[in-house]
């Protein structure tokens, strides 16, 4: 699966960005739980999820800054 670029994420609506952020935070929680119970097989999903979450949070903060000015 190809990673979405920042320009792809900037085209999402505010509601979609917020929804994806919530989903990724939930996914990271579940991954940490699986890791603690030794049920996690794909450890690379941590990195992918954290990276996408950081990109989405960056897009969200850019929008907040541009709306404030």
UniProtKB/Swiss-Prot annotation:
Give the matching InterPro entries: Ribosomal_protein_uL29, Ribosomal_uL29, Ribosomal_uL29_sf
Please indicate which superkingdom the organism of origin belongs to: Bacteria
Q: Which GO terms describe its cellular component?
A: cytosolic large ribosomal subunit
Q: Which Pfam families match?
A: Ribosomal_L29
- CDD domains per record: Ribosomal_L29_HIP
- Select a single GO molecular function from the record's annotations and give it: structural constituent of ribosome
Q: Which Gene3D superfamilies match?
A: 1.10.287.310
Asked if Translocase is a keyword of the record, the answer is no
Which key words are in the record?
A: Ribonucleoprotein, Ribosomal protein
Biological process terms from the Gene Ontology for this record are:
translation
Checking NCBIfam families in the record gives:
L29 (TIGR00012)
Q: Which family does it belong to?
A: Belongs to the universal ribosomal protein uL29 family.
Q: What name is this protein filed under?
A: Large ribosomal subunit protein uL29
Q: Which organism is it from?
A: Synechococcus sp. (strain CC9311)
């Amino acid at each position: 699966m190809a990673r979405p670029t920042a320009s792809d994420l900037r085209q999402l609506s505010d509601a979609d960005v917020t929804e994806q952020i919530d989903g990724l935070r939930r996914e990271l929680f579940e991954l940490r739980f699986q890791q603690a119970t030794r049920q996690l097989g794909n450890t690379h999903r941590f990195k992918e999820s954290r990276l996408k979450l950081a990109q989405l949070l960056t897009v969200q903060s850019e929008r907040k800054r541009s709306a404030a000015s």
